[in-house]
Amino acid sequence: GIFVIFREEADANDYLIRNRRRRSISVKISRADRIYDEHRETIDELVEFFTQRGRLPRRDESIDLQHRLRDAVGGLRRAWNVVRNVTEGTDWEAITAARCDDLLVDLALLKLNRRPNFMALPEATRHDIKEFFGSYKQATAEADQLLFSSGNTELVDETADAATVGKRLPTALYVHESALGGLAPVLRV
């Protein structure tokens, strides 16, 4: 066997303690976290765009941001993958669904005041419609269906009963203006 002899008892104890200790575990920072930390401001602009629009920018939108993302990360898709890896707990699909619902409510309410043609809408809204519905015709059809479903009193009552915001009375649902976004689309119409 191997014998180790020390002159001082403290050195022997130090040796024994060091040999029984687990090897130090190095903390590995994921590549996505490193990229995010290095380019936080630029990537945060992408996150802000997505939370406002519910989608990634198209090629002809936010061109400056896309150029900066290409220089920093390598492109829009790669930057989005970094965002998804860094923000694992965020439900991005819920943000997209909420923006889609907002757009449906807006289109349904525009029907009441003569809905404009597609080219009369703001460019960002046209991009949203193409992204979420594929065509203006499909979007207006779904908006009309939402508008007509708001006339179904049973559906409105069931939805009002299930509402998580506001005060429900037997014949009414009172909701503060700041909480309207938390209502189902059929109640917002």
Descriptions of predicted regions:
Residues 1-4, 9-189:
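Functional cation/ligand-contacting sites centered on basic and imidazole/sulfhydryl donors
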